[in-house]
């Protein structure tokens, strides 16, 4: 149901074991909060929370091919003010880049001086860390930054915004983004009540998460004007219950479970939580840096591959930094950019291929990828 309180045992029993008349596994929560029994935890902890609310904007329509302009007009310009820090989370890297550019232009056109940042897997890991640090510094100084990001921001990033905007996604993902709004406030007695996370549907949910997720996410939000934080637990619970009851979900789960029992590992290996990024390539980006860190670790990598540098030395002194300058991008963007091979497995990109704000420069003439962008 959440990262810290998963529902997988309940779903596994309902879908796989109950129909075989097998007993419910005895599941013990090892670390319930002190003073609470496991069955008391959900109601006792969550029902008093008042920091945020989810506000569906599913009545809005976005013209295909004109989604960014429609977003700026219907959502951003109407919901955001210069006195608010804002987190915008999208499902695709390309969408993230397009909206970042549009928001940046909007700020310039209106003479707003809010700091603006982009964060996605298209940006080097080394630069992502620097960016998060810069955002934290801006927030601590009382500035009102805007962050446009993909789902990478959900993975343990400790930031606190005044409002959020989320493209349609699994309900638990929405709740994670809501956790970056009014984050540091007292959960029960916040100074500001129920700061909003607006949820829209740009059409990118289905290609990333699948038709079942899109269908159930829409059903979970349908007819609701707003959902207060106290109701999040029930919202997530009902969402996963409904997913578990879908026939196609059950059929796939049973098929995988049967394959595991029969040791048919080829079928098991076909299971994917998200579509694999099969058509991606690893790219080392040799960006100019004051200490020439990228150039040094590239040279060390080549010396290691040629046998001039011991593996132990490379792993100890260069490996981490090498990976901090490596990203995975769709193959056709790399081919379109004319990158040169660093070795048989990794391509080399230079400053000319990399934008300091949005990362690897994706030629707009290349075909857009409908691949996940979590990590």
Predicted segments — roles?
Residues 2-6, 90-93, 149-152:
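A short beta-strand-to-loop transition that corresponds to the Sensor-1 phosphate-sensing loop
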């Amino acid at each position: 149901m959440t990262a810290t309180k998963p529902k997988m045992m309940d779903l596994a029993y309902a879908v796989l074991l109950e129909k075989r008349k097998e007993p419910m596994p005895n599941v013990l929560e090892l670390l319930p909060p002190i003073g609470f029994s496991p069955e008391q935890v959900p109601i006792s902890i969550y029902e008093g929370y008042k920091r945020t609310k989810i506000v569906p904007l599913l009545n809005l329509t976005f013209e295909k091919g004109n989604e960014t302009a429609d977003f700026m007009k219907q959502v951003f310009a109407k919901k955001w003010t210069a006195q608010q820090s804002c987190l915008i989370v999208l499902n695709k890297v390309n969408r993230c880049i397009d909206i970042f550019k549009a928001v940046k232009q909007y700020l310039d056109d209106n003479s707003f001086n809010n700091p603006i940042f982009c964060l996605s897997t298209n940006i080097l890991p080394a630069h992502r860390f620097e960016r998060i640090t810069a955002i934290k510094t801006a927030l601590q100084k009382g500035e009102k930054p805007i962050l446009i990001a993909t789902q990478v921001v959900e993975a343990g990033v400790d930031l606190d915004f005044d409002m959020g905007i989320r493209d349609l996604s699994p309900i638990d993902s929405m709740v994670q983004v809501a956790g970056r709004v009014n984050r540091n406030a007292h959960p029960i007695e916040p100074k500001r009540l129920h700061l909003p996370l607006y949820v829209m549907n740009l059409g990118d949910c289905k290609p990333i998460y699948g038709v079942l997720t899109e269908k159930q996410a829409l059903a979970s939000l349908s007819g609701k004007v707003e959902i207060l934080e106290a109701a999040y637990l029930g919202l997530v619970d009902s969402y996963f219950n409904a997913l578990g009851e879908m026939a196609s979900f059950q059929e796939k789960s049973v098929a995988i479970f049967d394959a595991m029992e029969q040791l048919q590992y080829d079928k098991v290996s076909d299971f994917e939580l998200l579509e694999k990024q099969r058509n991606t390539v690893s790219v080392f980006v040799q960006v100019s840096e004051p200490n020439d860190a990228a150039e040094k670790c590239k040279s060390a990598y080549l010396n290691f591959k040629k046998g001039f540098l011991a593996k132990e030395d490379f792993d100890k002194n260069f490996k981490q930094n090498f990976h901090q300058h490596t990203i995975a991008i769709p193959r056709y963007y790399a081919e379109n950019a004319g990158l040169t091979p660093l070795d048989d497995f990794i391509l080399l990109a230079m400053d000319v291929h990399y934008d300091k704000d949005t990362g690897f420069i994706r030629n707009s003439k290349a075909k857009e990828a409908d691949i996940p962008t979590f990590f």
